[in-house]
């Protein structure tokens, strides 16, 4: 049962709730796209076709922001890896967490956005650094299950690492 004291304390702090909420929203609004690369668990990716249009294929995927670029690990038969193999190296990336892209009702499109140039990263030393960083980032969200698969896959060819070099200013990617 609530006491008179509980009521008085509740009434005393109630006016501060909107101020606290505004402060939290203001901090979120002040976050830059680069900040989101450090805090988000997912990036949404689509290749840009040769005619300049986005591919119909998009996906949400684990990533790591390392040395200014975004890295993902994926099977070589996925559309994002095949696009790079076909020379479709321009890509658009959105950073945020909206669940499965097909069920997000396009919400990811309002997230911070980057244009990037994709390439297959083949250097074992880069693989090791990126996987170590991913292990730290995803330690609580499934790395125990996926980390060794990523590492083994990069060795046996069942996975590739894609580097997305973010365009200067995040906007245009030169030809």
Residue ranges and their predicted role:
Residues 1, 19-38:
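C-terminal segment of N-terminal export signals and the immediately downstream linker at the start
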Residues 1-15:
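N-terminal secretory signal peptides and thylakoid transit peptides that target proteins
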Residues 28-29, 78-80:
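Charged, amphipathic alpha-helical segments
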Residues 174-175:
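Short, solvent-exposed mixed-charge patches
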Residues 32-33, 49-50, 147-152:
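Short, P/G- and charge-enriched loop/turn segments at secondary-structure junctions
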Residues 36-37, 55-57, 64-65, 85, ...:
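Extracellular/periplasmic catalytic domains that process cell-envelope and extracellular macromolecules
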Residues 40-76, 93, 113-114:
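Short beta-strand segments
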Residues 79-169:
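Short, structured beta-strand-loop surface elements
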């Amino acid at each position: 049962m609530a006491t008179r004291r509980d009521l008085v304390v509740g009434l005393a702090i109630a006016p501060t709730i909107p101020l606290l909420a505004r402060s939290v929203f203001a901090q979120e609004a002040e976050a830059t796209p680069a900040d989101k690369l450090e805090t988000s668990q997912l990036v949404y990716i689509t290749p840009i076709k040769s005619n300049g249009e986005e591919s119909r294929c998009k996906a949400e995927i684990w990533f790591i922001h390392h040395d200014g670029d975004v890295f993902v690990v994926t099977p070589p038969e996925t559309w994002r890896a095949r696009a790079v193999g076909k020379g479709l190296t321009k890509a658009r990336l959105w950073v945020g967490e909206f669940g499965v892209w097909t069920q997000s009702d396009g919400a990811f499109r309002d997230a911070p956005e980057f244009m990037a140039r994709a390439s297959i990263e083949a250097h074992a030393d880069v693989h090791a650094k990126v996987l170590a960083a991913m292990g730290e980032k995803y330690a609580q969200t499934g790395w125990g299950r996926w980390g060794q698969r990523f590492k083994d896959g990069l060795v046996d060819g069942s996975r590739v690492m894609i580097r997305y070099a973010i365009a200067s200013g995040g906007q245009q990617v030169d030809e």
